[in-house]
Amino acid sequence: MKMWNALVLLVVLSTPAVAQTVEVKAKPLTDADIQLIRQDVQAQKNQIITDTMAFTESEAAAFWPVYKEYAAAQQAIAAKRWNVIVDYAQNIDKMDDQKAKDLSQRMFAIDDGIQSLRKTYYPRFEKALGAKRAAKFYQVDNRLSLIVNLQLSSEIPLIP
């Protein structure tokens, strides 16, 4: 139940930030705006992870340095996703097959990058937490990613 409440909180708190991202035509977001949104969402994620995982001192000492690197790598992938979203928004009214194919291939590469990142970092999280706790972390991380992606997807119109 605690996890559910935390996830609902993340959605509620991130909704205004995400909703702003689709107002590209009305008021373009600056890089500084995007960075602030990312920092806010990351702080919320950190709190949810802390609350859900209830780390011991030794686990926290081993986990957070690895997670900091992992989160930075996630941010790099998120930046690529943002670039695709912006490209999509700029081309939605004039979308042709070639542009749709290009955007799809870029998103497939991003999805592959996310899975590769998770596989790469799993041994490090397992070393820090043990296999069972590392698996739990990945459950939490996956749920948080799904919530953010669902919110983004709900704000992006389908190709006409």
Residue ranges of predicted features:
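Positively charged n-region of N-terminal signal peptides that target proteins for export
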Residues: M1-N5, Q20
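Sec-dependent N-terminal signal peptides
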Residues: W4-S14
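Sec/Tat signal peptide C-region and signal peptidase I cleavage site
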Residues: T15-A19
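Flexible coil/linker segments and helix-coil junctions enriched in charged and small residues
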Residues: Q20-T21, D93
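Amphipathic, charged alpha-helical segments and their helix-to-coil junctions
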Residues: V22-A26, D33-L36, D40, Q115-P160
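Amphipathic alpha-helical segments
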Residues: K27, I34-Q35, I48-A128
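Start-of-domain marker
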Residues: Q44-N46
